[in-house]
Amino acid sequence: MSGFISSTAAQGPPSPAIESYLFGCELSSKTKQYTFEVNEEDDAVHLVCLQTISLGAGAKDEHNVVEVTAPNYQNKEVTVPLANLKLSCQPMVNVGYFEIEAPVTFRLTSGSGPVFISGRHYVVASDDEDLSGSEEEMEDEEEEEDDDDDDDDDDDDDDDDDEEEITPIKPAKKPLKTLSRTF
């Protein structure tokens, strides 16, 4: 078996174009709700990838509850609490790249804020025409690689002689110690 893998075979089909932008919004007693919407005519997939939700300067020591409304896998809106922040015990939460597909609505349901939501906005372009053309190219490349692999099979036998056989490391045999109990 050859240790060389061509770069096109390892990569698989071409990945779609992804653009990344900084995302952030503020919720407070003045602005209780923020909606992230995209143009319906846009064929790209828009993802909001949240990183942190934190209380801002001037926040009171009260519970600030943030909830999010977004579509689920059946395209029905679902509302769930996202964070419960309090200045004295949890002023910030790291949500660890929590991805939500647009449209997304953030709402401050309790407290006066300010609450800052930050993360990234990813735009995944969908080019159906480019993908269909590249699939045909990939099939042609795979056929060429299969033809090349036949030539490499003869060389594989020579490579086995050069390599040393590696034996697994076995644990050392130690005598078991018995615990003596005195009562």
UniProtKB/Swiss-Prot annotation:
Keywords carried by this UniProt record: Nucleus
GO molecular function, one term: chromatin binding
Biased composition (Acidic residues): 126-166
Any one annotated GO CC term: nucleoplasm
Any Gene Ontology biological process: chromatin remodeling
Pfam families in the record: Nucleoplasmin (PF03066)
Superkingdom: Eukaryota
Region Disordered: start-end pairs: 126-183
InterPro entries: ARM-type_fold, Nucleoplasmin, Nucleoplasmin_core_dom, Nucleoplasmin_core_dom_sf
Major subcellular site: nucleus
Family recorded in the similarity comment: Belongs to the nucleoplasmin family.
Protein name, entry field: Nucleoplasmin-like protein NO29
Organism annotation: Xenopus laevis (African clawed frog)
